[in-house]
């Protein structure tokens, strides 16, 4: 319930631009957000392991 209400709260237009913040499109997490993909690091890792993000593969050196 709390996460749902935070998602709704974040969707409203803020009075000032600096108050807006980005959230993961999948889980709604506000921290560790990757702008390029629009998701958080945890969701990114899961999708990358499943091969659902084109051009991303596990690095090894």
Curated annotation (Swiss-Prot):
PROSITE patterns: RIBOSOMAL_S14. The keyword Zinc applies. Keywords: Metal-binding, Ribonucleoprotein, Ribosomal protein, RNA-binding, rRNA-binding, Zinc. The keyword GTP-binding does not apply. One of its GO terms (cellular component) is cytoplasm. It holds the Pfam family Ribosomal_S14. Binds 1 zinc ion per subunit. Coiled coil: none annotated. InterPro entries: Ribosomal_uS14, Ribosomal_uS14_bact, Ribosomal_uS14_CS, Ribosomal_uS14_sf. One of its GO terms (biological process) is translation. Zn(2+) binds at residues 24, 27, 40, 43. It comes from the Bacteria. One of its GO terms (molecular function) is zinc ion binding. Its cofactor is Zn(2+). Binds 16S rRNA, required for the assembly of 30S particles and may also be responsible for determining the conformation of the 16S rRNA at the A site. Belongs to the universal ribosomal protein uS14 family. Zinc-binding uS14 subfamily. Part of the 30S ribosomal subunit. Contacts proteins S3 and S10. This is Small ribosomal subunit protein uS14. It comes from Alkaliphilus oremlandii (strain OhILAs).
């Amino acid at each position: 319930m709390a996460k749902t209400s935070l998602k709704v709260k974040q969707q409203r237009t803020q009075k000032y631009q600096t108050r807006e913040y980005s959230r993961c499109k999948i889980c709604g997490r506000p921290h560790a957000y990757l702008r390029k993909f629009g998701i958080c690091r945890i969701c990114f890792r899961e999708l990358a392991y499943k091969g659902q993000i084109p051009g991303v593969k596990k690095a090894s050196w």
